[in-house]
Amino acid sequence: MQNKLTKMLNLVSTENDFYKDRLEKNAISCSLDLDQYPILTRKEVQENRYNMFSFGCKSKFFSQQLRRQYSSGSSGTPVNVYWLYKDYYASTLPLWRQRARYYGIHTNDRMVKFTMNAYNITHENNTIHYINDPNNVLTINASLIHNEDEMLEIVKLIKNFEPVWFYIQPFILNRLIRCYQTHNICPPATLRYIETVGELLPSDIRRRAIEFFGVRLANMYGTEEMNGIAYECPHHSMHILTDNVFVECLTTEGTIEREGQGQAIVTNLNNTAMPLVRYNQGDIISLTNQTSPCPCGNCAPIISLIEGRKMDEIIIEGATINTYLLVELIAELNNTYNDIITDFKFVYHNSLNMLVCYIHLTDNKNMWFESVAEDITQLFWKKQETKMELRFDVLPFDPNTETNKKFCVLEVKE
């Protein structure tokens, strides 16, 4: 890991103008000393997304030879991160190695993957959006699952597909178990592993999943910006994937530590096209260095706490609005309008049965507000069941106001 970190710091200090400028502005005397580097914020990545390319990679961006990873997550600040394809696949290898080592899961095993990507999809009642490509991967759109009938259709799809493992969010896993139990349906006999991603895994959902499916379950902590960050071993320790990332934490005292509790500060060790050095991931973690190897044999540091990731839902007349769908609305609009939305949040007013989308546009783009608001509204209803009685509105959002400093994707007010 240390060798890969040194190589990354050498690259950014010699082949990346964005970081060379940061070195000069922060009077960094040793470019290979990570401790001297300042924290990189999501806002900085958002504002400099076309200026962070290493030498030779901007031309690849314009010729569409880079892989784009979009992230808005639970932060409310959307960012794009670009990768060379070879770097992206190298970044996924550490996780695949651990899957094979711990649970016997390989790239050719049949997998059901629940995704939140809902671009260019108009929802129709009881229609399930999925693709089966490559042949061993069934990808199901989870942001457009609104009711029990649609979940039942997914159960039927899974049965016919005969998967070996699920890659699934706890929010969806809980609904899936409930559907199986409600309709007295047996889970697929081929299933032998579940991997939960995207949010916190509550202990009750973990217990229910293991009891119902009778398989091994592991939690994976990762992000679109970094790929895998930490992975749970059979002894329930979340080990850092040290061949992919270097993790620190920003404490409440403002110091950056290699151990302790605070905001996750992550350096990617594989992305040479658009390096992220000391990137503030935003999640609250507890980071522990092991004094002796874990019983699984892994000596890597352990993340024992992850806070700040929770997806909520509103159920209106039997239909479900979840934050995955809301986040994807913003993602699709940003894809259309070239990242015009810089900040967002949703507020549901229970007494008014009204959902409000608050957005903040890039500088000098406020003249586009009405057009963007209209498109958000149309897109929202395309992805919902039209029979639902709900008021929906789009209003301006000031991310700098005192009341908006604590962010959540979906806030519910009485």
Model-identified regions with their sequence ranges:
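Nucleotide 5′-phosphate-binding alpha/beta core
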Residues: 1-70, 75-109, 160-167, 189, ...
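Active-site glycine/GP-rich loop and adjacent strand/helix microenvironment
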Residues: 3, 7-10, 134-414
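Short active-site-adjacent helix-start/loop capping segments
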Residues: 30, 80, 120-123, 175
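Short glycine-enriched loops at secondary-structure junctions
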Residues: 65, 116-120, 171-172
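Short, charged beta->alpha transition segments
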Residues: 65-67, 125, 151-154
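Short, acidic Gly/Pro/Ser/Thr-rich loop/turn segments
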Residues: 78, 119-121, 271-274
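Glycine-rich, histidine-containing beta strand-loop boundary motifs that form or position
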Residues: 83-85, 115, 169-170, 221
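Conserved AMP-binding loop of ANL adenylate-forming enzymes
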Residues: 97-132, 144
